[in-house]
UniProtKB/Swiss-Prot annotation:
UniProt GO cellular component terms: extracellular region
Cell compartments where the protein resides: Secreted
Protein name, per record: Toxin-like structure LSTX-D5
Upper taxonomic lineage: Eukaryota, Metazoa, Ecdysozoa, Arthropoda, Chelicerata
Keyword Signal: yes
Annotated InterPro entries: Spider_toxin_CSTX_knottin (IPR019553), Spider_toxin_CSTX_Knottin_CS (IPR011142)
Natural source organism: Lycosa singoriensis
Protein family per UniProt: Belongs to the neurotoxin 19 (CSTX) family. 02 (D7) subfamily.
UniProt KW keywords: Disulfide bond, Knottin, Secreted, Signal, Toxin
Main location: secreted
Tissue: Expressed by the venom gland.
Length: 106
C-alpha cells in the first residue's frame, strides 16, 4: 500500500511539473506586454509628509521600506483629522543602521 502511495505521489509531481513547463513556454512578447500593462496601471505614490487622506495606501517607498499613512488631530481645537505619509521611527533607525553597515563594508 505504501509503494502505491509513493508511486501516485511521484506521478502527481511529474504531471504538475510537466504542466508548469507549458506555462513557461509563453512567448516573451506576451510576457512583456503583460508587464507593460501592469506598470501603466500603477498609480502615483504620495511623497513623505504630504496628505494621504484620499488614499491611505498610496505612500511612497523609501530606500527599504514603504512609508505609512499616519492620521492625527492637530492641536488648536480643530476636529478635522489630518493624514500624512510618514516613516515610523523604528524603520528609520533600521535604514540608518543598514546604510552605516553598507558604508563600513562597502
Amino acid at each position: 500500500m505504501m509503494k502505491v502511495l509513493v508511486v501516485v505521489a511521484l506521478l502527481v509531481t511529474l504531471i504538475s511539473y510537466s504542466s508548469s513547463e507549458g506555462i513557461d513556454d509563453l512567448e516573451t512578447d506576451e510576457l512583456l506586454s503583460l508587464m507593460a500593462n501592469e506598470q501603466t496601471r500603477a498609480k502615483a505614490c504620495t511623497p513623505r509628509y504630504y496628505d494621504c487622506s484620499h488614499d491611505r495606501h498610496s505612500c511612497c517607498r523609501s530606500s527599504m521600506f514603504k512609508d505609512v499613512c499616519t492620521c492625527f488631530y492637530p492641536e488648536g481645537g480643530d476636529n478635522k483629522e489630518v493624514c500624512t505619509c510618514q516613516q515610523p521611527k523604528h524603520l528609520k533607525y533600521m535604514e540608518k543602521a543598514t546604510d552605516k553597515i553598507k558604508n563600513l563594508f562597502g
